[in-house]
Regions:
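NAD(P)H-binding glycine-rich loop region in Rossmannoid oxidoreductase-like domains
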Residues: 1-26
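Conserved Rossmann-fold NAD(P)-dependent oxidoreductase catalytic core, especially the SDR/UDP-sugar
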Residues: 6, 22, 26-74
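Active-site segment of SDR-like NAD(P)-dependent oxidoreductases
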Residues: 10-12, 49-56, 102-105
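Conserved catalytic-core motifs of eukaryotic protein kinase domains, centered on the activation segment
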Residues: 14-20, 54-58, 110
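Short-chain dehydrogenase/reductase
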Residues: 21-22, 71-80, 115, 137-141
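Conserved catalytic Lys-bearing alpha helix of Rossmann-like short-chain dehydrogenase/reductases
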Residues: 25-31, 78-86, 121
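NAD(P)-dependent short-chain dehydrogenase/reductase
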Residues: 57, 87-140, 144-153, 157
Length: 216
């Protein structure tokens, strides 16, 4: 083994840090230890752009050490801890690289991960026949196959030691999506939409708490 690419994660934006720590933090520690055994191995840690806390002026060189993360958002907090561990290992000579992903969508052929929050939101709106008219979200998507190819390319070029943002600045507004389907969907206020989806949460993949956190 020459290279370890650590993309395994438990992605749950509603779970607290302690719930996600065994999978997202302890596993990272174990893989970093693996990279020091017998011979040094390159370690590529797949993180999230959200560790920057939406800082507008942040870039790959931004020091995230002082950025606070609420333990209630366990996913982002666990990725922040993972980055700190990866940087610490780099300090001790392990060739590490950090890849921060934005919102990764389907591949170019349309296959998508059904548990992703955006897919759940769109599915829920379609299932209910209603969308939220007084709240909107700007979304920037990257294709999963393009993202994977970029990571593989960086890993094979032996560019250890860097931090890379694998995301796009091109955004679209969710309201633009809904406008194309207004004849089939009813516009509701956030309160009305949440009340209706709560009644249907068994068939809308338990998205209520996630969307509440996202839009409120």
């Amino acid at each position: 083994i020459d290279t370890v690419i650590h993309n395994a994660t438990h992605m749950n934006h509603s779970a607290p840090y302690q719930f996600l720590k065994p999978t997202n933090v302890d596993a990272t520690q174990a893989l970093l230890e693996l990279c020091t055994q017998q011979k040094l191995k390159q370690f590529h840690f797949i993180s999230t752009i959200d560790v920057l806390n939406n800082a507008c002026s942040a870039d790959e060189a931004t020091d995230i050490f002082a950025l606070a993360h609420d333990p209630s958002n366990g996913y982002v907090a666990s990725k922040w801890v993972g980055e700190m561990m990866t940087l610490n290992a780099r300090h001790f000579g392990v060739p590490t690289t950090i890849h921060r992903l934005g919102l990764v969508s389907s591949d170019k052929y349309g296959y998508f991960e059904p548990n992703q929050w955006l897919i759940k939101l769109l599915y829920s709106c379609q299932h209910m026949g209603a969308y939220i008219q007084d709240h909107s979200v700007d979304v920037a998507l990257t294709y999963v196959d393009e993202t994977a190819n970029t990571i593989a390319g960086l890993a094979t070029r032996n560019l250890a030691g860097g931090t890379y943002h694998l995301c796009t600045s091109k955004q679209f507004n969710m309201m633009d999506v809904f406008k194309h389907h207004t004849s089939q969907m009813t516009p509701l206020s956030l309160e009305q939409w949440l009340a209706q989806i709560t009644q249907n949460d068994d068939t809308t993949n338990g998205i209520t708490s996630l969307i509440t956190d996202l839009l409120q």
